[in-house]
Every structure is written in structure tokens, then in C-alpha cells.
């Protein structure tokens, strides 16, 4: 499933209905239309740029032929704007200071920098003040679980890491540097991250396959004194919990008293179960074809269903993160259920089919995006200066996202032009019984809030 995006330059006669003919032709072959921009209006014609999305090269060819066959309409060019946008990469490292004189050089580099080095040597915490370390996150991947592409290697996964870095910068003013590791053994990844950790204020683990991701994150959280989070686990779980809170509010369902079923117990599924239990859901039931995954859920306090049918029959809320399109059958849907089929690009069941079968609420993964979570979570922990990201903090982040959602929406849209990204400070107190200490901190949680002009 390629999910190809192309931009068509289409010329139509300046007569009402011709744009509709083009849209109909695209829709008839299953293409999705994105942006439509008028490029030029001539004496008797209109030139438009039309962005379309299809699932395969064959479907793209069928779509192009359908547009070309329209009488009086000319398809001039077909371009890959996504590929063009990636030329040269999406991120860069630049100096914050201009160096235009000898005085500038002395302040920025030698000899002035020596005094700063000595100050940090005497008081290491001053590195957070006098360097970029305190506002810089490493995005670490081994390329074994890149989006829906699988084990394609770290270099092929670099565009994803650059995208994450760009979002960190634009949404939370956090510096983020992709770190590509050409190793696959957990102990090698752990040791490498430990070795480079002095240069960062936090570590975001990204697209590292299951089950290695669990060991890697747990070990790094134990052994490093900076916050570590695996986004495929906890970023996904935060936004999923926020979506469930919103869905329950709109339907009158008591989330904490509901039976929650999780189909698929990989990185995202296990973390989602743990997140719901941390929120206070009393009954969390999972299902996975892997005995090891099922055992992991039980070790965290969840239960395992004997079959998908049993889970569907008994659960009020069903979440699916399997990557298997059409896995959930319509006849399994129980009246009044909430269905969050979150796999991309195709869900386990289409929302329309779930609603038709009796679900009270249904959605797919297109609106449940990690971008609502990871930038603000790290902005929060970097501001607060905490060494660990706890479930208490993650639940607070999910609640902040849910509380900023407009009525009728599932979650906020972070890039809505009518919205601005703000931060709300929430005080978080939690007890670490293992260490027997009380830690009180401030967590700045990411949210998107309407500013009415």
C-alpha cells in the first residue's frame, strides 16, 4: 500500500461544471482529492493545481487516463510535490548568533568560550543554561519498524526522523537531531544511546521494532538521568486515550467503568493498555496472535481474550492497532460500542461499516496522530527539568489534549489555521514507591486551543 500523492496541472474551459467533471472522474476510480488551487484564469480557460492521493501505481495510471479522456480538458503535468519538498532534506542546523567581527568571534569561540567551559566544569548543571543541551532531543531509530513500511533500515527511515524534528521545532521550539543506528541488537542500541546521551536533554526512541523496543526503553529509563520515551508506544497511547476520553464524553459512556478491548499487542497496543489502566479503567482485555505479547499484557495487569470474537462480544470500547485491513467483521460489532480502528492507511474496519453495524461511535487512524503528543510532552519535561516521563504525566497530557477538543471533534487539529498552539501548565505530584520519594514537578502539556479573534 503506497499511498501515492501527486499534483495534477489541469486546464478546463471557463464554463460551470468542468471542475466537477474532473472531480467526478477522480472519484470514480477511488482517488482522494486534496488541495485545489487556481493557478491562472485565461480568456476562456482556467488552470488549476489539483492534489490527489491513490493507493498504487496502477490506480494512479487509471486516474490519469480518466482525466485525459475528458473532452475539452487538458492534463498538462503530473508532479510529485512530496518528493520535491524533500530535496536537500527538511531540517538544518544554524547558528543563533551572527559572526561578523573579531569581537563576535572571540565571544562565540576562542578565547571567550574557555570561561564558559570552566563554569560548566565547576557546575555541570550550567550546561543547561550556557549550551543547547537542555533544549535538544535525540530522535533515535534503528529503522526496524518505519511507519507502515516495516524494516527498511535507518537511512531509508531518515525522512520520517526529519519530519519529527521539523515538528519538534515548529510546534514546541525544541531542537531535535535524528540519530540513525546501523545496529539491531538491543544491548548495542542501549550502549550507543548511553554514550551519546551527554549531548542531549532527552531521548525519543522512534520506529524500533517490537519486542526489542520494550527492553531498550526500560533499560534506558533506568540507566539515564534524562527523560526517555518510545513514541510508538507512549505517544500513540497518549493520543489514543485522549480520543477515547472525547468519544466517551460525546456518547455519555463512563470510560473508567467500561470494558476496553485492545486488538494487537505490539508496541502501541501494550502501551495503550497500560495507559488506560493508569487512567483508571478497571477492565482492559487484549488479543494478539503472539503468546509473548499476551503474557506481557498479563504481566502489566491486563486480561487476554480467547478470541477476537470473545473480545468484540464483551467489550464496550474496542481499539485496534494491528495493521491488518478489514480484520474486524461487521457481524462482530455490538450495538452501542465505540470502535477506534487506528491502523493506517487502512483500518481494521471502516467507520461507516462499524456505525452501520450498530456502533455508537467509530473512527479510523487518520485523526489520531502522535503529533498531538510528543512535541508538547518533551517541551513539558524539558521545562520542568524532570529525569523521567511517568504515566501520571502522560495521563495529564492526554487529558489536556481531550480538554482542548471542540465539541463534535475527536481530538484537536494541530495545524488548523484558526488555532494556535499553546501550552498549559499543570502541576503534577506523584510518589515513586520503589525509591520511597515524593517528587513534585510542573508538566507543560501540549494542547491546541481556539483563539477567537
Where are these regions (language model features)?
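A conserved regulatory-domain signal marking ACT and ACT-like small-molecule sensing domains
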Residues: 1-87
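Helix-enriched interaction subdomains in cytosolic or periplasmic regions
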Residues: 88-115
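Gly-rich Lys/Arg/Thr-decorated short loops/hinges at beta-loop-alpha junctions or inter-strand turns
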Residues: 99-102, 141-151, 166-178, 197-200, ...
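Phosphate/diphosphate ligand-binding glycine-rich loop within oxidoreductases
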Residues: 140-141, 148-149, 155-159, 185-235
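Glycine-rich phosphate/diphosphate-binding loop of Rossmann-like nucleotide-binding domains
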Residues: 147, 154-172, 224, 230, ...
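Adenosine-phosphate binding glycine-rich loop
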Residues: 227, 231-232, 343-436
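Rossmann-like adenosine-cofactor binding region
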Residues: 300-362
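Short, often N-terminal, low-complexity regions
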Residues: 435-448
Amino acid at each position: 500500500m503506497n499511498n501515492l500523492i501527486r499534483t495534477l496541472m489541469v486546464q478546463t474551459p471557463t464554463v460551470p461544471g468542468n471542475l466537477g467533471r474532473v472531480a467526478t472522474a477522480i472519484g470514480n476510480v477511488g482517488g482522494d482529492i486534496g488541495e485545489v488551487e487556481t493557478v491562472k484564469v485565461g480568456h476562456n480557460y482556467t488552470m488549476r493545481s489539483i492534489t490527489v492521493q491513490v493507493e498504487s501505481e496502477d490506480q494512479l495510471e487509471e486516474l490519469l487516463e480518466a482525466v485525459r479522456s475528458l473532452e475539452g480538458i487538458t492534463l498538462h503535468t503530473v508532479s510529485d510535490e512530496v518528493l520535491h519538498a524533500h530535496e536537500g532534506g527538511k531540517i538544518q542546523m544554524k547558528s543563533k548568533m551572527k559572526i561578523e567581527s573579531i569581537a563576535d568571534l572571540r565571544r562565540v569561540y576562542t578565547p571567550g568560550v574557555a570561561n564558559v567551559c570552566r563554569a560548566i566544569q565547576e557546575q555541570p548543571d550550567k550546561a543547561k543554561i550556557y549550551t543547547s543541551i537542555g533544549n535538544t532531543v535525540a530522535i533515535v531509530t534503528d529503522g526496524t519498524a518505519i511507519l507502515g513500511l516495516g524494516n527498511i533500515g535507518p537511512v531509508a527511515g531518515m525522512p520520517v526522523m526529519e519530519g519529527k524534528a521539523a515538528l519538534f521545532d515548529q510546534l514546541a521550539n525544541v531542537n531535535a537531531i535524528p540519530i540513525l543506528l546501523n545496529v539491531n541488537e538491543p544491548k548495542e542500541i542501549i550502549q550507543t544511546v548511553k554514550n551519546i546521551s551527554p549531548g542531549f536533554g532527552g531521548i525519543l526512541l522512534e520506529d524500533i521494532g517490537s519486542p526489542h523496543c520494550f527492553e531498550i526503553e526500560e533499560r534506558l529509563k533506568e540507566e539515564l538521568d534524562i527523560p526517555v520515551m518510545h513514541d510508538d508506544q507512549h505517544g500513540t497511547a497518549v493520543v489514543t486515550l485522549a480520543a477515547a476520553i472525547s468519544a466517551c464524553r460525546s456518547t455519555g459512556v463512563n470510560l473508567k467503568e467500561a470494558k476496553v478491548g485492545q486488538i494487537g499487542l505490539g508496541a502501541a497496543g501494550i502501551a495503550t493498555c497500560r495507559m488506560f489502566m493508569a487512567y483508571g479503567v478497571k477492565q482492559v482485555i487484549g488479543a494478539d496472535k503472539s503468546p509473548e505479547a499476551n503474557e506481557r499484557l498479563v504481566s502489566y495487569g491486563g486480561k487476554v481474550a480467547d478470541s477476537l470474537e470473545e473480545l468484540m462480544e464483551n467489550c464496550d470500547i474496542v481499539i485496534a492497532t494491528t495493521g491488518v485491513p478489514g480484520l474486524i467483521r461487521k457481524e462482530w460489532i455490538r450495538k452501542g460500542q465505540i470502535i477506534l480502528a487506528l491502523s493506517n492507511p487502512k483500518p481494521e474496519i471502516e467507520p461507516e461499516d462499524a456505525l452501520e453495524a450498530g456502533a455508537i461511535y467509530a473512527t479510523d487512524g487518520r485523526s489520531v496522530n502522535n503529533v498531538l503528543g510528543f512535541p508538547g510532552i518533551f517541551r513539558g519535561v524539558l521545562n520542568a527539568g524532570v529525569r523521567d516521563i511517568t504515566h501520571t504525566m502522560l495521563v495529564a497530557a492526554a487529558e489536556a489534549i481531550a480538554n482542548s477538543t471542540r465539541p463534535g471533534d475527536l481530538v484537536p487539529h494541530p495545524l488548523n489555521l484558526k488555532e494556535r498552539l499553546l501550552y498549559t501548565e499543570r502541576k503534577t505530584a506523584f510518589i515513586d514507591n520503589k525509591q520511597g520519594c515524593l517528587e513534585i514537578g510542573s508538566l507543560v502539556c501540549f494542547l491546541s486551543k481556539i483563539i477567537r479573534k
